[in-house]
Design a protein with these regions (language model features):
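Active-site loop/oxyanion-hole signature of alpha/beta-hydrolase fold enzymes
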Residues: 135-180
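Conserved loop-alpha-helix segment in the C-terminal half of the alpha/beta-hydrolase fold
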Residues: 303-345
Length: 374
């Protein structure tokens, strides 16, 4: 394929053939790099139908020719300087797109990249380069026993070091934070927005006090009150690691507001991520309760600073979330270049329980940052 000559890949987005396929147009630039644009959906041509696929070039897109992480399948352990010395954090690149590079910030604090793995079913077909990343203390990254490192500003500095190591800049760098990750993304944008091309704030209010009020005034009154009383009693007695506490939360809170699927149907990456949460980070920062925040983040509020974030920003909320969707809509209105995406069937993990809305809205936002043509 010569420079500028396009070819088209049509990828099925639903194995049953009920959703239109997406058309991704690829061309080779003069410098040899691949560039793609993702058009709107084209008519469905039947189940499992892939047309005009150039397998060799598709493989190049995934392998990232000339990238230093090809041998490791996209994995890089990034050295991070901290006040207590150097540690390493785990990252994994998927895809190769010079214009759209998305770094994913997981929640918790202390959760893992794993619950983002559902993105693999959607972002590659849209030609988006994205990075999994376990923050320090999480999953595959170093896990120092150092409570003094679990500070917001220290995490912001870590993200900046990761950005530099991965070679991301304002021509391509999108940052997506979900839950605690959105807190971190807001803080990063307030300090380093000159490096951002765009920002995605997923399922997180800009004020922990407002979140606590929503939990107390809206979520808790709708719960079974006997179950709520037992949950509170277990929290007050410090028994949040008791299996009974988790069972009560699952039945009366999680399947309503965290992931609206029966527990036995929760996707394996979500179950795995929940099992790997580092409570040595989570409890000091978030607090032991799942019905509000009482840790180091309890007073965090950046609502009054949102107007300072000038990069294009997508705010994602959900009808059944633990986070007030009206508050998230207001966040988008406060951001100079904000837009709001509402997931009417979704909860805190709307990327799973309202996947079609979430992924199509995210991809549309990222596609807006591409060149229209070579």
């Amino acid at each position: 394929m010569s420079a500028g000559d396009p070819f088209i890949i049509e990828l099925q987005t639903d194995g049953a053939g009920s959703i239109p396929v997406a058309r991704t147009t690829w061309s080779r630039c003069g410098d040899g790099a691949l560039r793609c644009t993702c058009d709107q959906a084209v008519p469905n041509r039947g189940t499992n139908n892939v047309t005009e696929v150039d397998v060799a070039v598709t493989r190049q897109w995934f392998d990232g020719q000339g990238r230093p992480d090809v041998l490791s399948g996209g994995v890089r352990m990034v050295p991070v300087r901290t006040p207590l010395g150097e540690h390493r954090v785990w990252t994994k690149r998927v895809g190769n797109n010079p214009d759209v590079k998305l770094l994913l910030l997981h929640g918790g604090p202390g959760a893992t990249h794993e619950y983002f793995e559902g993105f693999d079913s959607h972002l590659p077909g849209a030609g988006i380069e994205y990075y999994y990343y376990d923050q320090l203390g999480s999953a595959y990254s170093d896990q120092p026993a150092a409570p003094e490192l679990w500070q917001v500003d220290r995490f912001v500095d870590e993200v900046e070091q990761v950005r530099v190591a991965l070679g991301l800049d304002s021509s391509n760098f999108y940052l997506l934070g979900q839950s605690w990750g959105a807190i971190l993304a807001i803080e990063y944008a307030l300090q380093h927005q000159e490096h951002l091309k765009g920002l995605v704030l997923s399922n997180m209010m800009s004020s922990i006090p407002a979140y606590n009020r929503y939990a107390e005034q809206v979520l808790m009154p709708t719960m079974d009150q006997a179950a709520l009383a037992e949950i509170k009693a277990l929290e007050d007695s410090g028994q949040t690691a008791d299996p009974r506490y988790e069972a009560l939360l699952m039945e009366h809170h999680y399947v309503q507001h965290v992931l609206r699927l029966p527990e036995q149907d929760w996707p394996e990456p979500v179950v795995r991520s929940f099992a790997h949460i580092n409570r040595a980070i989570y409890v000091p920062m978030q607090g032991p309760s799942e019905l509000g925040a009482s840790g180091l983040l309890a007073g965090w509020d950046r609502t009054g600073d949102l107007h300072r974030i000038e990069v294009p920003t997508l705010v994602i909320g959900a009808e059944h979330d633990t986070m007030d969707p009206a508050h998230l809509r207001e966040m988008a209105a406060r951001l100079p270049r904000g837009r709001y995406l509402h997931c009417p069937r979704g909860s805190h993990l709307a990327m799973y329980d309202d996947q079609e809305t979430y992924m199509s809205g995210l991809i549309d936002f990222l596609a807006a940052g591409r060149p229209t043509a070579d």
